[in-house]
Amino acid sequence: KLKPVGISFHVGSQQKSLESWEKAINISSRVYKNFLKKGILMNFLNIGGGFPTYYSKYKTDIKKYSQQILESINKNFGEHKPRNIISEPGRFLVADAGIIEAEIILITQKTFKKARKWVYIDVGRYNGLAETEGEAIKYEIKASNDNKKYKYESFILAGPSCDSHDIKKKKN
């Protein structure tokens, strides 16, 4: 016989909407209270999904996030909240822990009208940059030789494969 010990949810990676957390906490509290009515006390609430992190312009105010999530837990669970509340900060803690170094392997200029320059690098969707698909995560891109004498140009950044999903940046 299985004995439930807790409730866990995942609001989605890089979730910036506090309303999504509020909704998940509200649903969890209703499930928790239904079990409580049946005499089953669960000791854990795992609020998963990870707190959003800084990739380009968005910066998480972790104090605001934590405070609003805690207020939501207190409001929805009241006096009957689980003894242990587990958070999964995820990439909020580790996103800045690494750097990907890539080399340009090809630069092309298409010949048809209104064509843009394409820059291909040796890292792509299938070897390190899967989460950039659809520009969901916009990594900061810097040249290792950031010399001011070079002019800045607009281009499409793509990985090394022929897969149409291996495009890193279209809007630059």
List the model feature ranges, each with a label.
Residues 68, 80-172:
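Charged (often Lys/Glu-rich) extended helix/loop segments that serve as interaction or gating elements
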Residues 1-108:
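Active-site loop/helix belt of alpha/beta enzymes
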